[in-house]
Amino acid sequence: MTSTVKYTGNLRTVGIHISSSKRLITDAPLDNQGKGEAFSPTDTVATGLASCLLTVLGIKAKDIGIDITETFAEVEKVMGSNPRRIIEIKVDVHFPNTFNAKLKLILERSALSCPVAKSLHPDINQNITFHWPD
């Protein structure tokens, strides 16, 4: 088992990661009757995509002996209606260091192969942009 999730009232859930006992709290978003005091469930999907991209980048960087510490992603989730769903996830990945063209390509292709990116429904536009310093 990966986790347990409990509805605690007031449009909030608390998830417990079984192996670490870490908690993940979600609230309904402000635009859907919520307080917006925590990630919404759909925020966790968008954030999960960015986390997966960065994790896969970290694995590849470690394998090839380069450091990408301080690489970060900015995430924007776009919702649609009828039915209410995620229609686009925009992820801007910012690298603090530049590498040669070959290493950049290796890193970018590795990131795009992350399991979350490959698991999301094809109707969700994944707009992923990589930013390298000059």
State each model region's role.
Residues 1-47, 55-134:
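Extended beta-strand/beta-hairpin segments
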